[in-house]
Amino acid sequence: MLPLPAAQTLGIAPVLQVPGVFEPELCAALIRHLEVDCGGGDVSAVLVMQDGEQRLQVDPGIKQRRETIPRDPQLEARMHERLMRRALPEIVRVFNFEVRRRDPFKLLAYPENAGYFHAHRDNETPDVAHRRFALSVNLNQGDYTGGEFRYPEFGPHLFSPPTGAALVFSCSMLHEVRPVERGTRYAMTTFLA
């Protein structure tokens, strides 16, 4: 098969968008859990090598957000069930990939004028080399501006899925979360292998 002429192609990142992974009520419950039950989360850190040892360190030159692992087993079970029922079948269908492992869920908050994650890959260090796909569910589209995903190797296109929808993409793809300009962007993320 011959490639399409340039006029018929669009340079866009190979990202799977899955609508309705979480329903709005679950999204609202996850935001409440992060803000109330988990005290707003902790400042997100990055893993660095220091004096021959791996350490977590806050580095606003790389990312700035709050995060927590869910502390409510019932909420976590609801998230897992929806992932199994709504997202994983699409990953098999589109990427021909059978998920066998999932990293812990993380709830994220990207606050106004202080929420971003500069361009990075999700599987570059030995502790995360097992990761194959990232999955991120937007929890409150429309309550903020900015905060879109961008894949700079594939052009300027921005991705901001609706509330409850997921983006799934290869952990090897360079990507960023652009700065949040107004409001707070909430999301849930995990990594699949």
Q: Which positions does each model-derived feature cover?
A:
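Fe(II)/2-oxoglutarate oxygenase catalytic core
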Residues: 1-134, 138-166, 172-193
